[in-house]
Amino acid sequence: MSTEKTSQASKEYQLKEADVKKMLVATTHLGVRNIDRRMQFYIFDRQKDGTFVFNLQKVWAKIVFAARILVTIDDPAEIAVVANRPDAQRAILKFCKYTHATAFPGRFIPGNFTNRMNPNYCEPRLLLVNDPVVDRQAILEASYVNIPTISLCNSDANLKFIDVAIPCNNKTPMSIGLIYWLLAREVLRLKGSISRTEEWDVKPDLFVALPEEIPDEEESEDFYDDDEEEDEEFSAGNGNLFDEY
């Protein structure tokens, strides 16, 4: 009986075909032409042009692992989510909207985690960043005060001070949006907020920033602080970006 329950539970966490198709459409599986030796474990193949290809099973496994870490934080507001890259700002704000984490879109102000005189000073229990290169300042400060760090990592990422790496294409809007959507969905599933057997009614399109929508740094938070009606209008106006080709 226990073996059957274990087998059933493991099937629930398996990567579904529908999610694989979404990842392929969003080019989540494509890295860059350079590679860090510690990222080789996540590589499936290499294209003729030199682009490394991620193993999607390993990508999914790290998404589930990261989600299980995120749900251990009793107060989600103590999770800091940082993204300096404009293409990722809508994604992290939507992620924080549904998981109640704290977003730091735009330039990360030095001293947010280490300088008590900083008006934005905070002491998060966990850090989630979009890019270990662009968001290096946040990672360094987290290492100074022993904050565990989860990061989306491309094939050339430096994993210094990164505790959990989610291998993926973290440079294009569709891939970034999809990863945060998958992560938010898994967090809500683990918390029991949504069913694992039913489709989440929030579409991944809502996490994707289109080029003409990328705001100025100081306007980013207000720009993306929209309600459900505006979300529906955005989705209807742009169709389903993750339709199969």
UniProtKB/Swiss-Prot annotation:
GO terms for biological process: ribosomal small subunit assembly; translation. Its main location: cytoplasm. GO terms for cellular component: cytosolic small ribosomal subunit. Keywords: Cytoplasm, Ribonucleoprotein, Ribosomal protein. SUPFAM superfamilies: Ribosomal protein S2. The keyword Ribonucleoprotein applies. It is found in: Cytoplasm. Residues 211-245 are annotated as: Disordered. Disulfide bonds: none annotated. The keyword Signal does not apply. Residues 213-234 have a biased composition (Acidic residues). Required for the assembly and/or stability of the 40S ribosomal subunit. Required for the processing of the 20S rRNA-precursor to mature 18S rRNA in a late step of the maturation of 40S ribosomal subunits. HAMAP family: Ribosomal_S2_euk (MF_03015). PANTHER family: 40S RIBOSOMAL PROTEIN SA. Component of the small ribosomal subunit. Mature ribosomes consist of a small (40S) and a large (60S) subunit. The 40S subunit contains about 33 different proteins and 1 molecule of RNA (18S). The 60S subunit contains about 49 different proteins and 3 molecules of RNA (25S, 5.8S and 5S). Interacts with ribosomal protein S21. Belongs to the universal ribosomal protein uS2 family. This is Small ribosomal subunit protein uS2. The lineage of its organism: Eukaryota, Metamonada, Diplomonadida, Hexamitidae, Giardiinae.
